[in-house]
Every structure is written in structure tokens, then in C-alpha cells.
């Protein structure tokens, strides 16, 4: 039997929004099948043909390319307007995007400015499970394309009922939009798993905006990487963890719960700095601690929800799974994914592994990984408390003193590079420009300040092909 439609009133005044299933009355292409329709394929083809004409900043400087570019932009704008009946909740955005494309062409394809259409795109207002969006912007993709080329993406909202209840209660996060891929252009055939407004070409960045995370990509690469890593390390997976690796849908919902709590944590707690750390230049291990703090907060809250007597069965089950997801993604995927150049997520994964090992709840013995599961929660939560204590104390510290204290926290557990000036102490003082501006501190951080341990060096070699295979991965494969 088909599920009953999920209906919600749109916050922007349009007609009610219908989630799964959604079928147009005239029997033509519906948003349920749009990814295989000639309309979408035509739009995708036009976008893909336009991209090679652009340069890094998104402009098209070659006059000889302008006739072709104008024809492609005309096709794109026409498709955007034609999609309005399929995506009535995005009507304002689709029309505004068509206008932005046409303005870009009429102004000679200078650096694109899609601020107006970005302002019209408000997916956080309509978080309905199964609701679909068509997104077309000139943009770079985080951990993907560094050029602001036009991208076209079809996405679907993931908003299970238990997450809606959590968000309406203690875990409010009104700008958080979890989504899954339906189809995309080349900028997302990469490791990028986010859609953030600040990546879009525009004249100014809005102050507060939504953030979308591709939970299907997160879940799919987690399942592939952890399955391989657990086999290599001969880790005996608990039944619930194995269930998570076997079920993409369950993994997606688990990552949505994790991301919901992680994302809101950036704005909460005793913060000694502006929450928008991305705008600040500082030693990259500060980012390691902030991202890890948010993940460990999600872990701690998952433990609390699992243990609370009034937690419903569905939420309790997912809370248990969030704990496995945070732990395994951090120690198996984060630590060995990406280059060793200022890899702040890598350092966070290394730190969690070493912390667990040095607190003797994780063991690498006889070439087998063993985890004392009953003791893990308190040890993980203790690391979170260490970071929170650092933050609380640093409210009263100057910036560089906070940086030094943060380095001490990390280097107590992770061994720095032997050539590190940060680690070297001369005449009782760190070998840093202590009397100079903060820039000198940041410049002194090595690109790989905390190299991989011998355990991780060996694991990364065995895992390299699997890690590489996750680029472009979605819940569909």
C-alpha cells in the first residue's frame, strides 16, 4: 500500500505542500520523476555546456564565447520558469533565478551576482519529508570544486517525524535543512556534502541563512568506509552498529539527528570567540577542537536521550546509533580522509582515537581492534568536557593565550611533528613570536602539525582505494 501524503502548510503563503507521494493531476512529469525527465536532462545539459566557458570567479571573459553563453542562459532561464508548476513552493526562487541569469547575460557575463535569487530560496521554511527542490546557482562546492561555476542540483528533504519532534523541543535549529541527492552536475561529483549559501556568487552574504547537508552522502560513505575499516582491523561490531551499516535509510536518519545537534552547537555554549569561525584566521587545530566539540555534544546528548526514561522507542534507537556513527566516522573516516595540509577534521579524528586508546577503552592488540563498549560513553564525554573547560577558561584569556592553551590540550594527547616550533620550548618559552601579532602564531603552525600515528599510516594505506571511491557517492550508489 502506498503511504498517505504528508501535507504541510507552506510558510511562504503558497498552496499546501505535499510530500511523498506527489503526482501532478495532468499525468505529465511530476517532481517524483523529474530526475529522469527530458526537462531536467535538458537543463543539466545546458548547465554542463556553460561551465567550461566560465573562469574561476564565475565570469565569462571571452567575448567569442558570449553568443553560445547567451543561448545556453536562455535555455536555462526557460527551463527554470517551466519547472515552477512542479515546484510551486520554490516559485519565487525559480523566477528570480531566471531573472538573475538573464541579467548576468545582459551585463556581459561579468562576475555573477545571484543575491536576489538566493534571498528568494528559503528551503528551511518548508521542511517536509520527501519535498523536492531544484537548485541552480553559480557556486563553488565545499570539498569539491573551488571555482564558482554554475551548478544544478535536484534534492529531496529528509525530515522524519522523530527529528521534527526533537527540533520542536530541546534541539531547535530552524535553519537546518537535511537533504539527499537526486541528481547533480560535476561540482557535486566530488566529496562535497553540503549546500551553503556563502558558496554562491553574490554581491553580499546574508547575515543569517539556512544550511543544507546531504545526509545520504554522509551515510553512504560512512557505511562503505566503516565496513572496510572494521574488516581490516578485525573489529567485532556490535549488532546495532552492524545494522547501521546494512541499512542506508536508517543511516540517513541517524546522520540527520547527529547533524541537527552538531549544527546548533556552533552557536551554543561558553564560547570565547565569534561562533562564525570560518571568518577568522587562526591555527587550524582550533577548528579541529570546535568541530569535535560539536560532534561530542551530539554524542553526549545521544547518550542522555538513550538513557532517559521518557524517550520514545524510535528516538532511543536512533540515539544509540548516533553514538556509533560519531565514533566510527571520526576514528575511521575523518582521520584518514583528505590531504595532510591543515586537515582539521583529520586532527579531530586522530585526537578522539588517541584519547580512547590512552584511556584504555580502545585497544590495538595482536593486530586486532577491541573496544570496551560499556566504558566508552563516559570516556568520550570526558573529552568533550575538556574542550568545554578550555572554552570557559578562555573567555578570560587573550586570543593567543587561548591558542596556546588549546595547543596544550591537543598536544597532551597527540604527538606534534618533531620540527614544530609550537612544540619546541627554548629557555622555558615556546619558540614562537610571543611579542608579535597573532599572525606570527598562525604562520608558525606546520601544514601537518600533528602527523598520523604509525597505526593510522598503516590503516590509511590499506584504506586509500575505499576512501577515494566515496567521491560522488550518494544513497543510490
Protein language model annotation of sequence segments:
Residues 255-271:
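Active-site recognition of the HExxH zinc-binding catalytic motif
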Amino acid at each position: 500500500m502506498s503511504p498517505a501524503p504528508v501535507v504541510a502548510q507552506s510558510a511562504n503563503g503558497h498552496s499546501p505542500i505535499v510530500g511523498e507521494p506527489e503526482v501532478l493531476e495532468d499525468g505529465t512529469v511530476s517532481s517524483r520523476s523529474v530526475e529522469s525527465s527530458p526537462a531536467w536532462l535538458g537543463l543539466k545539459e545546458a548547465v554542463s555546456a556553460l561551465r567550461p566557458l566560465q573562469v574561476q570567479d564565475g565570469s565569462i571573459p571571452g567575448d567569442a564565447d558570449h553568443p553560445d553563453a547567451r543561448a545556453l542562459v536562455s535555455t536555462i532561464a526557460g527551463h527554470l520558469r517551466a519547472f515552477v508548476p512542479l515546484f510551486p513552493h520554490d516559485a519565487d526562487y525559480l523566477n528570480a533565478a531566471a531573472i538573475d541569469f538573464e541579467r548576468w547575460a545582459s551585463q556581459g557575463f561579468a562576475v555573477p551576482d545571484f543575491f536576489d535569487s538566493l534571498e528568494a530560496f528559503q528551503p528551511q521554511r518548508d521542511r517536509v519529508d520527501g519535498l523536492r527542490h531544484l537548485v541552480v546557482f553559480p557556486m563553488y562546492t565545499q570539498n569539491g570544486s573551488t571555482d564558482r561555476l554554475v551548478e544544478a542540483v535536484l534534492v529531496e528533504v529528509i525530515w522524519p517525524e522523530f527529528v521534527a519532534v526533537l527540533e520542536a523541543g530541546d534541539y531547535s535549529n530552524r535553519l537546518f535543512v537535511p537533504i539527499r541527492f537526486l541528481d547533480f552536475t560535476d561540482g557535486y561529483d566530488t566529496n562535497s556534502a553540503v549546500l551553503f549559501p556563502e558558496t554562491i556568487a553574490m554581491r553580499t552574504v546574508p547575515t543569517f541563512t539556512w544550511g543544507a547537508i546531504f545526509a545520504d552522502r554522509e551515510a553512504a560513505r560512512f557505511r562503505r568506509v566503516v565496513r572496510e575499516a572494521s574488516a581490516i582491523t578485525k573489529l567485532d561490531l556490535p549488532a546495532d552498529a552492524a545494522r547501521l551499516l546494512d541499512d542506508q535509510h536508517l543511516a540517513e536518519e541517524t546522520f540527520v539527528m547527529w547533524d541537527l545537534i552538531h549544527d546548533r552547537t556552533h552557536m551554543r555554549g561558553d564560547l570565547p570567540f565569534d561562533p562564525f569561525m570560518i571568518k577568522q584566521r587562526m591555527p587550524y587545530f582550533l577548528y579541529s577542537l570546535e568541530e569535535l566539540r560539536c560532534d561530542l555534544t551530539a554524542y553526549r546528548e545521544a547518550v542522555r536521550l538513550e538513557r532517559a526514561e521518557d524517550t520514545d522507542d524510535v528516538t532511543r534507537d536512533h540515539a544509540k546509533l548516533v553514538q556509533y556513527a560519531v565514533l566510527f566516522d571520526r576514528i575511521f573516516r575523518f582521520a584518514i580522509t583528505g590531504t595532510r595540509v591543515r586537515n582539521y577534521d583529520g586532527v579531530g579524528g586522530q585526537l578522539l582515537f588517541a584519547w580512547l586508546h590512552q584511556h584504555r577503552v580502545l585497544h590495538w592488540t595482536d593486530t586486532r581492534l577491541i573496544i570496551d563498549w560499556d566504558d566508552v560513553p563516559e570516556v568520550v564525554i570526558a573529552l568533550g568536557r575538556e574542550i568545554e573547560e578550555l572554552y570557559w577558561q578562555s573567555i578570560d584569556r587573550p586570543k593567543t593565550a587561548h591558542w596556546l592553551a588549546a595547543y596544550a590540550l591537543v598536544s597532551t594527547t597527540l604527538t606534534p611533528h618533531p620540527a614544530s616550533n609550537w612544540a619546541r620550548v627554548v629557555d622555558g618559552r615556546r619558540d614562537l613570536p610571543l611579542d608579535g601579532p597573532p599572525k606570527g602564531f598562525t604562520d608558525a603552525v606546520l601544514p601537518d602539525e600533528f602527523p598520523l600515528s604509525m597505526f593510522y599510516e598503516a590503516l590509511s594505506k590499506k584504506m586509500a582505494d575505499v576512501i577515494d571511491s566515496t567521491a560522488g557517492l550518494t544513497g543510490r550508489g
